[in-house]
Amino acid sequence: MRNIYFTDGSPEGFFTAVFDAYADKDAFVSSSKALQTALDDRFIAVSPVGEKAQRVVKKLRAVDKNSLCEIDFILRTPAADREQTAFDYIRLLVKQRRPVRGMLVRPEVRRAMELVDRVGAERHLL
C-alpha cells in the first residue's frame, strides 16, 4: 500500500508534500491527473503551506544551494514522474547531507540528472 501525496503542481505545494511525506517510507508524490493507482493506495491531498515549504527550502540551501535550481528544472519537465523523482533526490540529498549530483550509480540521482539535462538541452534550442 502506497500513500500518494497529491499536490496542486505548484513549487510551494510540492515542497509542502516533501515536508509531509519525508518520513513515510511508502510515500509517492504526484500532481498527475492521469496517475495509475492500485486498489489499496491511500490518497493524501496536500495544500500548499508556506511555512512547511520554506523549511524544506531552507534545509536544501543548507545542504546544497545548487540543488534548488536542479529541482526547479526537474519540476519543469513534462515527465509523469517528475515530482517523485525530485522527492527521491531530495530524500537522498538530506540523508547524505552533502551534494549528490555526482552519485550517478544511484538510480534516483541518474533519473534526476537525466531530467535536468533534458531541460538544459531544451533551453539551448530556444
Regions found by a protein language model. Name each.
Residues 1-50:
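N-terminal ordered "arm"
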Residues 8, 20, 24-26, 40-41, ...:
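Acidic-enriched, low-complexity/disordered segments with a strong bias for Aspartate over Glutamate
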Residues 95-126:
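Internal, well-folded beta-alpha domain core
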Residues 53-104:
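A basic- and aromatic-enriched beta-loop-alpha substructure that forms the phosphate/nucleotide-
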Residues 15, 24, 29, 39, ...:
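Generic marker of "main functional regions" within proteins
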